[in-house]
Amino acid sequence: MQVPKNDVYTVSRLNGEVRQLLEGQLGRIWLTGEISNFSSPSSGHWYLTLKDSHSQLRCAMFKGRNTTVAFKPINGQQVLVRGSISVYEPRGDYQLLIEAMFPAGDGLLAAQFEALKMKLAAEGLFAQDTKRPLPESIQRIGVITSPTGAAIRDVLHVLKRRDPSVEVVIYPTAVQGTGADKDIIRAIELANQRLEVDVLLLTRGGGSLEDLWCFNSEALAHAIYNSTLTIVSAVGHEVDTSIADFVADVRAPTPSAGAELLSGDQSHKQQKLAGALARLTQGWRHYALKRHSGLISLQSRLDRQDPKRQLQQQSQRLDELELRLTSSIQRRLSSHTLTTERLKARLERHSPAQRLMMEQQRLTYLDERLKGAMEDRLEDAQTHLGGLSHSLASVSPLATLSRGYSITRDAGGRVLTQASSMKTGDTIETQLEQGSLLARVIEIKPE
């Protein structure tokens, strides 16, 4: 049988292509599981296994990433992690490289929120061109909220102060707890059936992510999107953001701000200004969402090509060698100690007192030499490991930055090697050991 040379893989080539395939196809993922086999060697990296009732997966979280974790992981703890699948090529093992870790609970809600936001954005529910404008003239406002909460009091107070002529129709609903999202959906559908108001204000006061969870319902998002009436979302405090905020035609940071947005102070000019500001805010949110998605994609590409990945692989290998060396030395020391004890016992059984004393002195001398030899061996091994670590650091492309060199890239992030590839007026970025410089080309000098 003739085997084509180009079809024969080496083990290293196969492991490398499997790593590229996994990293390119899966990208970043969220994963939940129970911690086991947690270890933290002297390098500062974390190694652990995440498991459930049927499967387990090896994981690594390198120093620099794990410093952002607000708690110390322990075996048996349920966690939620974000990371990327990779292959540890020396062994051919696939593993998860963890970037962020949270205790199971709030972290799971946050992950569900991000997943739903990405899904609805892909479906077009956040698209700016589908937003309904605020009416030119607002005479009657429908308020969807709890009739006994602080939000309705704030809204009524602002409307009375700014424009007492505006009428208010309250659609009472639950705004927290199981089934609250269904109540809100029914209120939106009722208002669209009656068509008795010019605009709807969906609002409630602030609270935790769990308190506001009913506003992150996929069904509610579609109800807001399908509404004939313009909907203004004013949920929580300024720092709170919900799915309803992204789908609504206009988002106000607080209930009071929503009321101010819909009240005109008797001025048509202010109404137009408020509408323009609201559209600008939505446009910025849409732009920021697109930029965020682009940055995530770029970060994933950088992670796959980052030379730090090779350093991490070598650092992980050094950790394994350190553990194996320590274990080997301990086994040899235990073996020699056991042999010494056996010889001592034989001498005690068969030798007279004087011979026993001489042999005991000899054994003591041999024991000291043995310990000295083992200590010398351990010191040599540690020196060798230090040399390997120093050699690894010296070949890092980033090490040249500490010697005064720099790396210059064009606006697209490509490394520049020829001045002729740029034009006068182009923007370039120069990376130094600490920080970077953004500059513009004013003159190009040939070689």
UniProtKB/Swiss-Prot annotation:
Keywords attached to this entry: Cytoplasm, Exonuclease, Hydrolase, Nuclease
Q: Which domain of life is it from?
A: Bacteria
Which Enzyme Commission numbers does its entry carry?
Answer: 3.1.11.6
Q: Which reaction does it catalyse?
A: Exonucleolytic cleavage in either 5'- to 3'- or 3'- to 5'-direction to yield nucleoside 5'-phosphates
Q: Which top EC class is given?
A: hydrolase
Q: Which GO terms describe its molecular function?
A: exodeoxyribonuclease VII activity; nucleic acid binding
Q: Name one GO cellular component term.
A: exodeoxyribonuclease VII complex
Q: Where in the cell is it found?
A: Cytoplasm
Respond yes or no to whether keyword Lipid metabolism is given for this record.
no
Mainly localized where? Answer: cytoplasm
GO annotation, biological process = DNA catabolic process
Family statement: Belongs to the XseA family.
Q: What does this protein do?
A: Bidirectionally degrades single-stranded DNA into large acid-insoluble oligonucleotides, which are then degraded further into small acid-soluble oligonucleotides.
Instruction: Note the subunit structure.
Output: Heterooligomer composed of large and small subunits.
Write down what this protein is called.
Answer: Exodeoxyribonuclease 7 large subunit
